[in-house]
């Protein structure tokens, strides 16, 4: 039996930094959506554990530090003999690393879902989310995999079930950006919270709501990597209704009126910057399905 599933890109449509705890963790409020595009993960029966990397961003992800292998090992630590049988894991890495769109966290979350299904381990969503939190603050929201408001340090999740699908263009200038460096460069750590969550809104109404919000990490990221400003200006020039950085960067997204306009903008930017990661996709209203092959 082979199981596979997409590990979707996580898009912070809005991200407000509203405080800082005494332990140093920042308090956030973020409207999060997930894209129809992402990495792809599969697991299948094997005589011995194997881990195969494929895709354009596979380099440098070998070894014990990989989020997927950490997810496998954490499940074995918790469930012992129930998770002992060997497994062949393949990760097709389609998302840039350290790019603000949750690639590693989404990989870990998808690994947890696939492996618990493969080993026939029954867990409650809350239990799996707690396991995921041990792998990273963003893993629980990636396990949820649907539009949501994240708060606290990212562990408090409130579903936003009526968020419309949005045509978006993802653009990364081909440079990794470390999250700790961005948070360390923050000047203001106590900002206004998000407006009331958008519900039952059309795509146009959602865009208007987003114009009332921001990504508070964007100025700090720009101070470290000024090319992010070029990305944002290009998205605006090519017709994005709104252009913003996702997460701690450096990936930016543009929301477009139609999928066709997003693709056309992507083609134009790719021609001007062939070394950049450019992908037209859309946000999705539900989590990706696990499939048997």
Curated annotation (Swiss-Prot):
Q: Where does ATP bind?
A: 96-106
Q: Where is the active site?
A: 10, 138
Might you give the EC number(s) for this enzyme? Answer: 2.7.1.148
Against InterPro entries, the record matches this protein to: GHMP_kinase_C_dom (IPR013750), GHMP_kinase_C_sf (IPR036554), GHMP_kinase_N_dom (IPR006204), IspE (IPR004424), Ribosomal_Su5_D2-typ_SF (IPR020568), Ribsml_uS5_D2-typ_fold_subgr (IPR014721)
Q: Which UniProt keywords apply?
A: ATP-binding, Isoprene biosynthesis, Kinase, Nucleotide-binding, Transferase
Source domain of life: Bacteria
In the record, the note on similarity to other proteins reads: Belongs to the GHMP kinase family. IspE subfamily.
UniProt protein name: 4-diphosphocytidyl-2-C-methyl-D-erythritol kinase
Supply the source organism for this entry.
Chelativorans sp. (strain BNC1)
Gene that specifies this protein: ispE
